[in-house]
């Protein structure tokens, strides 16, 4: 595992007009379960389908239609819990969360308030090389997503698309362990990375498949430590919840604004009202949405249509045995097996496809060289052209072939970059392309010696300077490489020049 040095969470300190204040943040992440069918029906979960085309009788609450649990969604929740080192509850239960809204046809949401499927876990968030913050997970529960209300299609009417209704969500609830906007964004990024590695959520925030509700409060220095001692949340101040955040940048902006808003109220002698707020990215501010409800406002009660969900430890063990290598373990292995730096390992493991690409290139080759080419040449070009690692123009096998030609001395580093450019635009086998384009280095020492002798004979003054100052021998190396059209092997040229000059 990673060799990480833990330190006490350093809070974001905001200077008010009268006092210093500290931030306290807890998050509820709504992650859409990667599943072809919904949580309690067989309707499709395909994104972007025609409005109301992925709706079953269960989803639209037709009379007499009963929910049937999707076993795969349950397995995905268990897999997520295991990935977060969490307690898997072998017995859980579903409850009805009652509220009325046009995009909720049942008049209630099926959720898990009292007995969630996953208990306490943790997420390790690396904030700097060797420094990590441990964010505790309070619980993960399964619930239904709601539909989508559309208000901008007609000036007088609102429309509802029920395609999303009943899609399985995992609500991942953290403890108030996050102490700043940057930490909050890093936590969401790390959680999304883990979910993608597990294959339990695609983490696509643009499509709403990963959304964050952010609870923000401010307190005076020293109050957080009192909370840690007593577990009394009153020490943390009154929290406000910012709903449905779907951007790392907006999460940071919203937290910063909300903290300053609360500080201004408190320093003016007022009280922060516990409420739900929305973030307006155009104005860069949060605004009130509704007063914050408590659990009793939703009149939760056990869903009479669903028996308690009982799973066997043997089934959990089977899922555990099929778990993939997760980001932290993969990073540690890359550093140990391939000798890459902490920074490079972070870049290479950020996405599963990137890690797989690198490993195919690096296997049996110089790991540091492979990392350099993947990060600087491949990723640099992908970013420049707005492409993704999922379908790169230069495949891992091709890049590996380029590195093999460098290792064998057949091409130089400069030739390799030219070859990479050709492969990017035209494709082909690296060795065949290099041969066809006459890109192979001159390694024949006889030919190199002839070129060196000619350059030395034509430049006697430069020879004397080089003998007086050996660093000037590089001039001869450059001239020889230039004379051979860039094809002479630099290492061989260096050796022969030094020998001829008696250095």
UniProtKB/Swiss-Prot annotation:
Keyword Nucleotide-binding tagged: yes
SMART domains registered for this protein in UniProt: GatB_Yqey (SM00845)
UniProt KW keywords: ATP-binding, Ligase, Nucleotide-binding, Protein biosynthesis
GO terms of molecular function: asparaginyl-tRNA synthase (glutamine-hydrolyzing) activity; ATP binding; glutaminyl-tRNA synthase (glutamine-hydrolyzing) activity
PROSITE patterns registered for this protein in UniProt: GATB
EC number in record: 6.3.5.-
GO biological processes: glutaminyl-tRNAGln biosynthesis via transamidation; translation
Pfam family, one: GatB_N
Reactions mediated catalytically: L-glutamyl-tRNA(Gln) + L-glutamine + ATP + H2O = L-glutaminyl-tRNA(Gln) + L-glutamate + ADP + phosphate + H(+); L-aspartyl-tRNA(Asn) + L-glutamine + ATP + H2O = L-asparaginyl-tRNA(Asn) + L-glutamate + ADP + phosphate + 2 H(+)
Keyword flag Endoplasmic reticulum: no
Leader sequence segment: none
Enzyme kind, highest EC tier: ligase
InterPro entries: Asn/Gln-tRNA_amidoTrfase_suB/E, Asn/Gln-tRNA_Trfase_suB/E_cat, Asn/Gln_amidotransferase, Asn/Gln_tRNA_amidoTrase-B-like, GatB, GatB_C_1, GatB_Yqey_C_2, Gln-tRNA_amidoTrfase_suB_CS
Family, as annotated: Belongs to the GatB/GatE family. GatB subfamily.
Cited function: Allows the formation of correctly charged Asn-tRNA(Asn) or Gln-tRNA(Gln) through the transamidation of misacylated Asp-tRNA(Asn) or Glu-tRNA(Gln) in organisms which lack either or both of asparaginyl-tRNA or glutaminyl-tRNA synthetases. The reaction takes place in the presence of glutamine and ATP through an activated phospho-Asp-tRNA(Asn) or phospho-Glu-tRNA(Gln).
Subunit structure: Heterotrimer of A, B and C subunits.
Protein's recorded name: Aspartyl/glutamyl-tRNA(Asn/Gln) amidotransferase subunit B
Encoding gene (name): gatB
């Amino acid at each position: 595992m990673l060799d990480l040095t833990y330190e006490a969470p350093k809070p974001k300190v905001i200077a008010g007009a009268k006092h210093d204040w500290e931030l306290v943040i807890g998050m509820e992440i709504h992650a859409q379960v990667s599943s072809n069918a919904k949580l309690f029906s067989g309707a499709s979960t395909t994104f972007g389908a025609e409005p109301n085309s992925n709706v079953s009788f269960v989803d639209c609450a037709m009379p007499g239609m009963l929910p049937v649990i999707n076993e795969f969604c349950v397995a995905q929740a268990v897999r997520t819990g295991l990935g977060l080192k969490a307690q898997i509850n072998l017995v859980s239960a579903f409850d009805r969360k009652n509220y009325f809204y046009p995009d909720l046809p049942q008049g209630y949401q099926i959720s898990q308030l009292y007995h969630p499927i996953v208990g306490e876990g943790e997420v390790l968030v690396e904030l700097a090389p060797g420094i990590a913050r441990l964010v505790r997970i309070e619980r993960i529960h399964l619930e239904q997503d709601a539909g989508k209300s559309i208000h901008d299609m007609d000036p007088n009417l609102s429309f509802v698309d029920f395609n999303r209704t009943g899609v399985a969500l995992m609500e991942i609830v953290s403890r108030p362990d996050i102490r700043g906007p940057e930490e909050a964004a890093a936590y969401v990024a790390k959680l999304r990375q883990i979910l993608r590695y597990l294959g339990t959520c695609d983490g696509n925030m643009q499509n709403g498949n990963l959304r964050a509700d952010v609870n923000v409060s401010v307190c005076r220095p020293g109050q957080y430590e009192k909370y840690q001692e007593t577990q009394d949340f009153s020490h943390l101040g009154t929290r406000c919840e910012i709903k449905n955040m779907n951007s790392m940048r907006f999460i940071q902006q919203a937290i910063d604004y909300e903290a300053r808003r609360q500080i201004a109220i408190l320093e003016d002698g007022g009280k922060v009202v516990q409420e739900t707020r929305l973030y307006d990215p155009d104005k860069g501010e949060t605004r009130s949405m509704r007063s914050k409800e408590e659990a009793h406002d939703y009149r939760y009660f056990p869903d009479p249509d669903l028996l308690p969900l009982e799973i066997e430890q043997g089934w959990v063990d089977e899922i555990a045995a099929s778990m993939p290598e997760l980001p932290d373990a993969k990073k540690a292995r890359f550093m140990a097996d391939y000798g890459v730096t902490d920074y490079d390992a972070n870049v290479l493991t950020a996405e599963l496809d990137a890690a797989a690409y690198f490993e195919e290139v690096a296997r049996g080759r110089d790991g540091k060289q492979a990392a350099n080419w993947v990060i600087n040449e491949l990723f640099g070009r992908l970013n420049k052209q707005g492409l993704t690692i999922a379908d790169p123009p230069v495949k891992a096998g091709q890049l590996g072939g380029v590195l093999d030609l460098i290792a064998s001395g057949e091409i130089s580093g400069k030739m390799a970059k030219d070859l990479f450019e050709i492969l990017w635009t035209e494709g082909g086998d690296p060795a065949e392309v290099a041969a066809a384009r006459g890109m192979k280095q001159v390694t024949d020492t006889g030919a190199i010696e002839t070129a060196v002798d000619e350059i030395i004979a034509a430049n006697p003054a430069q020879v004397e300077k080089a003998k007086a100052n050996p660093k000037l021998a590089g001039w001869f190396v450059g001239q020889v490489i230039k004379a051979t059209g860039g094809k002479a092997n630099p290492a061989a040229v260096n050796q022969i020049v030094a020998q001829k000059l008696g250095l």
